[in-house]
């Protein structure tokens, strides 16, 4: 079981699609050695030091959190079905309404579109909000994503800078 890293008043909650097998085995988010999440959020400015998956609780010190759309582990995120994503989207809305972070960053455009019945989403800030929480769509940091590290960092940094401008 992989636990959410959540608390009231966070700057951002990063929402992965679902845990991979490495994460399910270790019990930590983004645990596969090829996953670039920890490197990306550090280089984008969310953390002062490069955290390891087993240090995930330290994210709360930086007012960041993690959750996921679907709890079922798979080898690849494309193994998650539409029903699971829609159900996960409804549960995610409840969590975000409870915790009200400044931003929710969903890590994957297709997962966002399916979970929230949206079409034609663009990267970055979305038009919808959950209460006062801005919704962002960022590229998934999985090693299976073809985006370069620099492109990932650039996308995540845009969110970090927007939060700084908002005083968060």
Swiss-Prot record:
GO MF terms here are: DNA binding; pyrimidine-specific mismatch base pair DNA N-glycosylase activity; uracil DNA N-glycosylase activity
Q: What class of enzyme is it?
A: hydrolase
Q: Which UniProt keywords apply?
A: Cytoplasm, DNA damage, DNA excision, DNA repair, DNA-binding, Hydrolase
EC number(s) of the enzyme?
Answer: 3.2.2.28
- SMART domains from the entry? UDG, UreE_C
Q: Which reaction does it catalyse?
A: Specifically hydrolyzes mismatched double-stranded DNA and polynucleotides, releasing free uracil
Query: What CDD domains has UniProt attached to this entry?
Result: UDG-F2_TDG_MUG
Where in or outside the cell?
A: Cytoplasm
Q: Name one GO cellular component term.
A: cytoplasm
Q: Name one GO biological process term.
A: base-excision repair, AP site formation
The principal location of this protein is cytoplasm
Instruction: State the oligomer form and interacting partners.
Output: Binds DNA as a monomer.
Similarity comment? Belongs to the uracil-DNA glycosylase (UDG) superfamily. TDG/mug family.
Q: Outline what the protein does.
A: Excises ethenocytosine and uracil, which can arise by alkylation or deamination of cytosine, respectively, from the corresponding mispairs with guanine in ds-DNA. It is capable of hydrolyzing the carbon-nitrogen bond between the sugar-phosphate backbone of the DNA and the mispaired base. The complementary strand guanine functions in substrate recognition. Required for DNA damage lesion repair in stationary-phase cells.
NCBIfam families with a match to the protein in the record = PRK10201.1
Full protein name = G/U mismatch-specific DNA glycosylase
Name the source organism: Enterobacter sp. (strain 638)
